[in-house]
């Protein structure tokens, strides 16, 4: 029997397919988390800041001053820790 039989090649290909599919799913999950944390939370924070501006019109704050805060940077770092 040759050292590389067709059965072992087939099992290697199927295991590689499983590994690649899990890696692709993980990439999609991280992309969705990145979008939700950075983009979605920024939109939510802008809405909150706009509500605060409407309520406290005498104390106006620029909503774009706080878009990127350390909270979002920490969450972005946590996404890429495997």
From Swiss-Prot:
The cellular location(s) given in this protein's UniProt record come to: Plastid, Chloroplast
Q: Which UniProt keywords apply?
A: Chloroplast, Plastid
Superkingdom of source = Eukaryota
One GO CC annotation:
chloroplast
Principal cellular location given in the protein's record: plastid
Q: What name has this protein been given in UniProt?
A: Uncharacterized 9.9 kDa protein
